[in-house]
Amino acid sequence: MPLSLLLTCLSTTVTLVSPAVLDPCSAYISLNEPWRNTDHQFDESQNQPLCDNHMNGEWYRFTGMAGDAMPTFCIPENHCGTHAPVWLNGSHPLEEDGIVQRQACASFKGNCCLWNATVEVKACPRGYYVYRLARPSVCFHVYCGHFYDICDEDCHGNCLDTTECACSPGTSLGPDGQTCFDENECEHNNGGCSEICVNLKNSHRCACGVGRVLRSDGKTCEDIEGCHNNNGGCSHSCLGSEEGYQCECPRGLVLSEDNHTCQVPVLCKSSAIEVSVPRELVGGLELFLTNTSCRGVSNGTHVNIVFSLKTCGTVVDVVNDKIVASNIVTGLPKETPGSSGDIIIRTSKLLIPVTCEFPRLYTISEGYVPNLRNAPLEIRSRNHGIFPFTLEIFKDHEFEEPYRETLPTLKLRDSLYFGIEPLVHVNGLESLVESCFATPTAKMDEILKYYLIQDGCVSDDSVKQYSSRDHLAKHFQAPVFKFVGKDHKEVFLHCRVLVCGVLDERSRCAQGCHRRVRREVGEDEDSAGLQSQTLTGGPIAIDWED
């Protein structure tokens, strides 16, 4: 069975650390390993695949037998010493462009950009390039190097004379005046493709999304109308009917969101990620995660692997409007037959990348006193998982003991201690309370509302923020108040929380109180379709009479 049929959906963009103060053209790390070169084909029978999981956003230069620069065209899988080689999906910059951002893509199972990350590139005065490379979210990924054609001083190849070079079609002369770099035709009008353009060495090709095929012109796409055409685009079974067709999966696999691809079931929860691999797909292989001490356990029908966002080598990153947790399940032959009697294997290796996505933006509502049930807020992402926060009312400024058993009576001029608490503590993430406002009813769209925090700024001078050891937790103190009117005896709080990567110095969380940025950046976040859900607790009657 092709490994591509086992892939869960992946789209990962890695957050970079802040750039170094020194000019990266003179402060870089050389990558000179011969196996990085695009000509080096990986042989699984002789070696283990390599991975660049040691990288952490430093600047690098390709030298020696690794090559001159990153390739700007799709590299087939099982090259550059690994399963999923990484190439630069975009042209190299000119020296006057300074530092630019480009997309880096990893090729795997026929998909030239199954994973992607953002890297930074700079053209240096001496004719070479340096790259600020992010750590891959999963293994096995390696950044590739490539030897580009050079027009030498003796005027061999396509040289016009001893001082001027002419490059072959599909390439252009680099900043050193000698090297011919591949042109990315996809950067110009998407290469003429109606949907997907894939840049190749000295050329390009068009492709279509799932369930669609190229027309005879090789550029435009059309819907697959039945199982007779490319199996309906289905990864496994295609069933035709008078109304059309539908894809079906074998027992143990589930249909993904594209309604065409079958994948291993993955359950995304904030407390744990659960992967369940059908036993017949495993055979005599032993399954483990990036941290090989985390291994699968068989229940007879499935091999199950359960891990958290903080264990087993799981990588957590912020990608646009999502928190993305990634790991990879690897299957290798057992050294001895297992207890289930496996004495043969049907595949030499199994790779199942796993990704869970959680939304970044949450809206939490609570009365002055939590409901006695104290149910946590669980916000469901559009497709994949939940990441819970609670709005707690604490007994004092230590913010260690929230009210649990009894509802206190709060009086005017008392201090109200409240905070945003994550139910899962994950390193590498932080939160920003974008707004907190009070209403006399549980409705968030109540016309009568009073803001304590707005645009990440404390809007009431009586509100005090306390520091917290956890980047995701936020603690505040405010005087107890009520709304004017004898009928207004209850107060509800509503807080809007955004989650970001700690190392992303350009994130909304890092900017903190900044109303202008809130209008510009926040509107983009809202337009991205962030989902929120309201949990309402309380209310409590305020003892406001002397």
From Swiss-Prot:
Give Gene Ontology CC terms.
Answer: nuclear envelope
**Domain spans labelled ZP:** 261-516
Q: Which tissues is this chain's protein expressed in?
A: Liver-specific. Expressed only in the hepatocytes.
Where does the EGF-like domain lie?
182-222
Disulfide-bond pairs as recorded: C186-C197, C193-C206, C208-C221
Q: Which SMART domains match?
A: EGF (SM00181), EGF_CA (SM00179), ZP (SM00241)
- Coiled-coil intervals in this record? none
GO molecular function list: calcium ion binding
The protein's name: Oncoprotein-induced transcript 3 protein
